[in-house]
Amino acid sequence: MPTTNIRNYIDLLGMFNIGLENGLLEKQEIVKWADTIILQDEQPDYFVIELSLCGHKSVNDIVTLLNEIIGASTPQISGRVILGLLYHRYVDRQLPLKKVVDLLYWLILYGQCSEEEKSFMYELDDRYSLAIDNIYGTVEAVEKATLRFIELYKEFRIDNFDKWSEVNRTIDQKITNLKTVVEEENKALIQGSGKTILKKAWWKFWAK
């Protein structure tokens, strides 16, 4: 029987960490994963045993435990998997749009996202606030834009960990393609309205 090297699962643990911290995952999902590893291993890693027994612990205690292995920075791919999880749970009507947007903003701050990803997320957060306050745009339009963005990550699932690296290699190009589409849409909108769209300073590529 194999013996799991917990260091090979840093990306997965990072995803668990983000999901727990933001209420997207339940601690029993982590316990279930650890139990599965224990059953398949001849000599389970002590850390996996700790996770298996953490069902009675608080979320904060489990997050602290995970951080002992993950370290100071959560891997970028962990945040991208969370985006995939957001997509599936939103389309399955398990999450409200506000929860999705709130988690996007959290990922801007702590998710090790690329600058292009942050630009999309900043825009969605700002558009949502403006729509909710009845200042500009509609919630329906924000929902459509949000879904179009997080759909890029839909091939990430908790149960296809062995495919994460392969899926991750496709993400940057998908983001580039979406960026091009949005730029073309903005140009058409400007030409159609004859007006200049005000852009936030942090939306770096929108003005290019």
Predicted regions and their residues:
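Acidic, Ser/Pro/Thr-rich low-complexity regulatory regions
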Residues: 1-208
